Amino acid sequence: MSLQMVTVGHNIALIQPGFSLMNFDGQVFFFGQKGWPKRSCPTGVFHFDIKQNHLKLKPAIFSKDSCYLPPLRYPATCSYKGSIDSDKHQYIIHGGKTPNNELSDKIYIMSVACKNNKKVTFRCTEKDLVGDVPEPRYGHSIDVVYSRGKSMGVLFGGRSYMPSTQRTTEKWNSVADCLPHVFLIDFEFGCATSYILPELQDGLSFHVSIARNDTVYILGGHSLASNIRPANLYRIRVDLPLGTPAVNCTVLPGGISVSSAILTQTNNDEFVIVGGYQLENQKRMVCSLVSLGDNTIEISEMETPDWTSDIKHSKIWFGSNMGNGTIFLGIPGDNKQAMSEAFYFYTLRCSEEDLSEDQKIVSNSQTSTEDPGDSTPFEDSEEFCFSAEATSFDGDDEFDTYNEDDEDDESVTGYWITCCPTCDVDINTWVPFYSTELNKPAMIYCSHGDGHWVHAQCMDLEERTLIHLSEGSNKYYCNEHVQIARALQTPKRNPPLQKPPMKSLHKKGSGKVLTPAKKSFLRRLFD
């Protein structure tokens, strides 16, 4: 095993415990950013590009017919194929937490709409469920099983908020284990069915799940009610005949006590479990090798990585599976130093000696993953789980190398110029100021003379003013040239005020005109 430190560009603030990674044809995409998406990347999905131990997050594109996909932390995700032999990969996303700490009960299906010049356009659709709809939750698992030429989703575990009748102001965000029900979900028709299995007595969350053909293995996990991490090992088998599906569960010996572990696949039938927690305040520093057979599973300890002192002394850690036996790890930065980063990141290669040369290039230059996940401090009740499919690994997949020249080189662009004598924008210390900014400062064009660009923040522009100027066609002048521009302008001619004529105060109004008939009547009246 080899451990390498990874540096991150300006988007490091987007990475937080609970994010997910999705792999589409060798390209990995980041999902679950911190906070709500900005205007510069309204989708909240980024290309997760690692080259020479440096990570860049580049905004992804969605088709016009896509639904809105909110950033979700600790969702259950898995890759999905219509059949076990299909080459078309989709990703299923269920549950998770929004930036407002609301829990989602929706199912989203992510797929590739088109791919042009290595630029991927996604399509996201929301699937409505009927039947026994799972309650909103996070920290659970979802896997896909294949039986008799059909496929079905298997959802289990997780945590949810207390029932509305029990939630109070003081305990509004208190969570509890979901009931230990197993849900079968038909992604084609949107039907969900709940199964109660006697072998599953306690609710679990942040466990490890592995799917192989018609079987799902559940390892470890944490029970919030008893605050223990039992050495669980369950085998859930699903049979899909023409009629009603058959679901059975078997308790197997030889489990491990772990929660929030990271799972990566090193071979068709071999997985490595890294990280997680074995006690409330104790990280699990050993690694386990999981070998799957037709009806068997074996778990054994393997070589322990040469952890750095920062990782050893860190109270929490989190990460995700990058694929090809590589794991992405993160630990909190040192808050004692003024210029310390929020997090430090590493890549851990678990099976470098078994990879081909092409796969080694993939591990060095481009992250890859079959299934996502993350962890976070257990004392904050924020753990995560991972799931993987034994049939999803393909060591011979061709990787389409990403062309760095397709992107703009930020070092030669004019974003980091000194726009005015009081400009203090520096590439090393700059942080986003406007909601429209992501990794570059917002600029506006000054129309004085031949014209030049200035930073909107240096001009003290309000965000609504900046948006108004960018949408319209009015000329803008910077603070240094605005007085010169005003002096050169010809003042507009103001038309004279038109005063309404005043009525004469002594003018008598016109009297009433009496007709001859009325005059004759009045004469006879007074005579």
Curated annotation (Swiss-Prot):
Residues 361-370 have a biased composition (Polar residues). Its main location: nucleus. Disruption phenotype: Mice are viable but fail to produce mature B or T-lymphocytes. Very immature lymphoid cells are present in primary lymphoid organs. These cells do not rearrange their immunoglobulin or T-cell receptor loci. Double knockout with TREX1 does not show a visible phenotype. The keyword NAD does not apply. Belongs to the RAG2 family. InterPro entries: Gal_Oxase/kelch_b-propeller, Kelch-typ_b-propeller, RAG2, RAG2_PHD, Znf_FYVE_PHD. The gene is Rag2. Component of the RAG complex composed of core components RAG1 and RAG2, and associated component HMGB1 or HMGB2. Pfam families: RAG2, RAG2_PHD. Keywords: Chromatin regulator, DNA recombination, Metal-binding, Nucleus, Zinc, Zinc-finger. It is found in: Nucleus. Residues 359-380, 490-511 are annotated as: Disordered. Maturing lymphoid cells. Zn(2+) 1 binds at C419, C423, H455, C458. The keyword Cytoplasm does not apply. Core component of the RAG complex, a multiprotein complex that mediates the DNA cleavage phase during V(D)J recombination. V(D)J recombination assembles a diverse repertoire of immunoglobulin and T-cell receptor genes in developing B and T-lymphocytes through rearrangement of different V (variable), in some cases D (diversity), and J (joining) gene segments. Changing E199Q: Does not affect the endonuclease activity of the RAG complex. This is V(D)J recombination-activating protein 2. One of its GO terms (molecular function) is phosphatidylinositol-3,5-bisphosphate binding. GO terms for cellular component: nucleoplasm; nucleus. Changing E407A: Reduced interaction with histones. It comes from Mus musculus. A zinc finger (PHD-type) spans 416-484.
